[in-house]
């Protein structure tokens, strides 16, 4: 079986593109991707989540709300979630955020001025809107600009388009560097071949 992985690496971000042949199993369904992320969060000891509503990762929200080991808080603005996550970390929790990439754009200053300045390692999982088969035109400008914005702010990020495999290694790097890391979850993850 021939599987090719292409990595495009900038100073702060890694984009993974995995090309698969016909012998490779199809992309997991939406629920499979969300379940893999849920299992990753549990396995890595995350125990506090901040979420902002998003239709793409709604199945993951349901899984988290039904779990007794992870406390999940819904916020009304993503910047609010940055502050809540920072407070949870300082209180001894291992927090993560689930948001849309548009909200990530709104939160860049809070991430840089709070999380980066005080070396708070928050995992930010964002559904990556505006770059792949986007049906809402208003999402496209930020979707195109987001990787450049993250690079400019020196915020490490990873774009997952076909597989969740690089996620664990990326998070190990986050904790060893004590700084926030962003994972952009492409809609491609949620498609079936």
Question: Could you describe each region identified by the protein language model?
Answer:
Residues 4-193:
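Thiamine diphosphate
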